[in-house]
Curated annotation (Swiss-Prot):
Role noted for this protein: Protein that inhibits host translation while promoting late viral translation by ribosome shunting. Blocks host cap-dependent translation by binding to eIF4G, displacing MKNK1 from cap initiation complexes and preventing EIF4E phosphorylation. Binds to the tripartite leader sequence of viral late mRNAs and recruits host eIF4G, PABPC1/poly-A binding protein and 40S ribosomes subunits on viral mRNAs, allowing ribosome shunting and efficient translation of late viral mRNAs even though conventional translation via ribosome scanning from the cap has been shut off in the host cell.
Keyword RNA-binding: yes
Main localization of the protein described in the UniProt heading: host cell
Keyword entries, A-Z: Chaperone, Eukaryotic host gene expression shutoff by virus, Eukaryotic host translation shutoff by virus, Host cytoplasm, Host gene expression shutoff by virus, Host-virus interaction, Inhibition of eukaryotic host translation factors by virus, Late protein, Methylation, Phosphoprotein, RNA-binding, Translational shunt, Transport
Biological process, per Gene Ontology: intracellular transport of viral protein in host cell; symbiont-mediated suppression of host gene expression; symbiont-mediated suppression of host translation initiation; viral translational shunt
Species of provenance: Canine adenovirus serotype 1 (strain CLL) (CAdV-1)
This protein's name: Shutoff protein
Protein family (similarity comment): Belongs to the adenoviridae shutoff protein family.
GO MF annotations, alphabetized: RNA binding
Miscellaneous comment: All late proteins expressed from the major late promoter are produced by alternative splicing and alternative polyadenylation of the same gene giving rise to non-overlapping ORFs. A leader sequence is present in the N-terminus of all these mRNAs and is recognized by the viral shutoff protein to provide expression although conventional translation via ribosome scanning from the cap has been shut off in the host cell.
Compositionally biased region (Basic and acidic residues): 645-655, 678-689
Protein encoded by which gene: L4
Stretch list, region Disordered: 1-24, 625-689
Biological classification of the source: Viruses, Varidnaviria, Bamfordvirae, Preplasmiviricota, Tectiliviricetes
Length: 689
């Protein structure tokens, strides 16, 4: 049956259109006859000639703004790049702080290369110590994960000195070489029989003998001043030979003076004492300063909180869920709060077992390195010539006590008391560590591996793979890295990051560490659980103001208010900073009874629960409409035989007649009319009937 064509003009198809053989002629119809469009439309109105130049104009304005305060115009690309980075990343005027505490977005950063590492901020992070990898490194220890396993009751690790480690062994020890191992004399890594899959692939694809370890030494100004006054006088560089310091390169303490202090002229004894002092200046004082910075109770707590943000773990994960705000988008650096939504905090959930522990341990190690380097960079920048002169005077006072001390640990403590005073330590404890995410540490990890000549995308290497796990298996210059590795391992177990203990229901965000249980965990704090059920369910206000004005005072528990109080909630008496002491393994109750965060009085909490329950019962019994469970969506007041209904329907399904029953009798006067819904709007719990 043919159809009549639609009225309109017919437009024939172009001749170059290819159609199958014996196909009908294709025609298109225009419903409204209009003049034909121009063959070549004018696009000047859409993209003008000057439109694309706005990008260059904006970038030129930023570059011009970066050099306006300089006395001389930069004449090279490097000078201009440095000025450009300083203007963007280190402005003279600090960025404006928003109401939520973070800095406002800087549109100038849109013109900085996104994945380029800025040189201005990396004042201390770009320095490395290229050193030969010990054969006894962690990668050549097949049972390193088992050796690093910690249990209930284990304490903070301590560092070693030459007092306890007199000899160092760098070798494979009792490790068994794999039968099919490749013979590679250029690589330190050896294929072992019990290597895990990650290390087996790494050793087969990587040949390496040296590694660029991140610099962890004290600020250069400090080291130079201490060495000039304790070890060897440094010769001042000068272009004129006549101006060279004749005392340059000479020992600060002569053999005559040292023999008089030690009451001996034995050359071996004098040389041994000099080595002890040199070791304390170059190694032990660094270890002592690290221990003082990272092991105070407040610092251990702050490191634990940082790790909970970095790995979106425990109480931080619970706070994100209840507040419906991704708190892990916040990062800090040098006292400035930033909001960045590109960071990842859940990458560790994609791996399990030993690989997961290796990744988390390495990430925490990098966080400690990053924190230490940040502190050293700030310290270096703050030192002036007057500070160094006063430091030289203090070092001169302890010169004789150091050279007459026989314990290298005590030497390090005496020296740390001078160069790392309590005031400086207190300042660092207040501002560090920074809150970071896993993406930042992954970039830091790639930066370290690239400086070591290792391509991160083609190997599965971690910086901690090239660090020995025992002090007796590495040279003293590697001891700071071993100490930070063991500290990172302790923080991993102390904050319960190595195992996934989460479950369903109340155990969804369960963490066994002292920061979470028992006070910030719904499974162990029933009072706080009851409080969370009241969030957003009430709004209590006082009497109204004059002329019907609303009350200015009231009580309303919002998710934001509860989350703020929840994040501040902490009981120091139930926190064990220097020991793994999980709450679930204890038979005694907590020192402080777990309480809610905002509504701390149990009587008020109970009354609010009774009001909430009575309101729910009233809505289910007296309210009209169908009420749905907010979580499952199931009807809470399902339709059924009603003792209040006066209609029973009969019929064939199409025409039903109401039937009066005995329950339709009117008692106590005429029946009240049903409540009317305003505009038919649904209740917050369900939908209107």
């Amino acid at each position: 049956m043919s159809e009549e064509p639609v009225s309109g003009t017919t437009v024939e198809i172009e001749e170059d259109t290819h159609t199958p053989p014996n196909s009908p002629v294709l025609e298109t119809f225009s419903l409204s006859p209009e003049p034909e469009a121009e063959a070549c439309p004018n696009t000047d109105r859409y993209l003008s000639a000057n439109l694309l130049c706005k990008h260059l104009q904006r970038q030129s304005a930023i570059v011009l703004d970066s050099i306006k305060d300089q006395l001389q115009v930069p004449t090279s690309v490097s000078e201009l790049s440095c000025a450009y980075e300083r203007s963007l990343l280190c402005p003279n005027i600090p960025p404006k702080q928003q109401s939520n505490g973070t800095c406002e977005a800087n549109p100038k950063l849109n013109f900085y290369p996104t994945f380029l590492v800025p040189e201005t901020l990396a004042t201390y992070h770009i320095f490395f110590v290229n050193q030969k990898i010990p054969v006894s490194c962690k990668a050549n220890r097949a049972k390193a994960d088992k050796a690093l396993t910690l249990q209930e009751g284990d304490c903070l690790p301590d560092y070693e000195t030459m007092d306890t480690v007199s000899r160092v062994f760098e070798g494979l020890g009792g490790e068994v070489v794999a039968e099919n191992a490749l013979q590679n004399n250029d690589s330190v890594l050896v294929e072992l029989k019990e290597d895990n899959p990650r290390l087996a692939v790494l050793k087969r694809n990587l040949s390496v003998s040296h590694f660029a370890y991140p610099a962890v030494h004290l600020p250069p100004k400090i080291i130079t001043t201490v060495m000039n006054n304790l070890l060897v006088k440094r010769a001042n560089p000068s272009a004129d030979v006549s101006e060279l310091d004749p005392d340059g390169g000479q020992e600060v303490v002569s053999d005559t003076e040292l023999s008089r202090w030690l009451n001996t002229s034995d050359p071996e004894t004098l040389e041994k004492q000099r080595k002890l002092v040199m070791g304390s200046v170059l190694v032990t004082v660094v270890l002592e300063c690290m221990q003082r910075l990272f092991t105070s109770k407040d610092m251990v707590k702050k490191i634990g909180e940082t790790l909970h943000y970095t790995f979106r773990h425990g109480y931080v994960s619970l706070a994100c869920k209840i507040s419906n705000v991704e708190l892990t988008n916040v990062v800090t650096y040098m006292g400035i709060l930033h909001e960045n939504r590109l960071g990842q905090t859940t990458l560790h959930h994609t791996i399990q077992g030993e690989t997961r522990r290796d990744y988390i341990r390495d990430s925490i190690f990098l966080i400690l390195i990053h924190t230490w380097q940040t502190a050293m960079g700030i310290w270096q920048q703050c030192l002036e010539e007057e500070n160094l002169k006063e430091l030289a005077k203090l070092v001169q006072k302890i010169k004789k006590p150091l050279y007459t001390e026989t314990s290298q640990r005590l030497m390090g403590k005496q020296l740390a008391n001078v160069v790392f005073p309590p005031k400086l330590l207190e300042t660092f404890n207040k501002g560090l560590p920074d809150i970071v995410n896993q993406s930042m540490m992954q970039n830091f990890r790639s930066f370290i591996l690239e400086r070591s000549g290792i391509l991160p995308s083609m190997t599965c290497a971690l910086p901690t793979d090239f660090i020995p796990i025992h002090f007796k298996e590495c040279p003293p210059t590697m001891w700071p890295y071993t100490y930070l590795l063991r500290l990172a391992n302790f923080f991993m177990y102390h904050n319960d990051l190595c195992y996934d203990m989460e479950g369903e229901g109340l155990l969804e965000h369960y963490c066994r560490c002292n920061l979470c249980t028992p006070h910030r965990c719904l499974a162990t704090n029933p009072a706080m659980l009851n409080e969370t059920q009241l969030i957003g369910t009430f709004d209590i206000r006082g009497p109204g103001g004059e002329n019907g004005a609303e009350s200015s005072s009231g009580l309303k528990l919002t998710a934001g208010m509860w989350t703020s109080a929840f994040l501040r909630k902490f009981e120091s008496s139930d926190y064990h900073a220097h020991k793994i002491h999980f709450y679930e393994n204890q038979s005694k109750p907590p020192s402080v009874e777990p309480t809610p965060c905002v509504i701390t009085q149990s009587s008020i909490l109970a009354q609010l629960h009774d009001i909430k329950k009575a309101r729910e019962e009233f809505l289910l019994k007296k309210g009209q409409g169908q009420y749905l469970d907010p979580h499952t969506g199931e009807p809470l007041n399902a339709a059924g035989p009603s003792v209040e209904s006066g209609h029973e329907f009969q019929g064939d399904g199409r025409h039903r007649e109401p039937k009066r029953g005995r329950h339709f009798r009117q008692r106590g006067g005429p029946r009240k009319p049903p409540r009317a819904h305003a505009g038919g709007e649904p209740d917050v719990r369900g939908t209107t009937s």
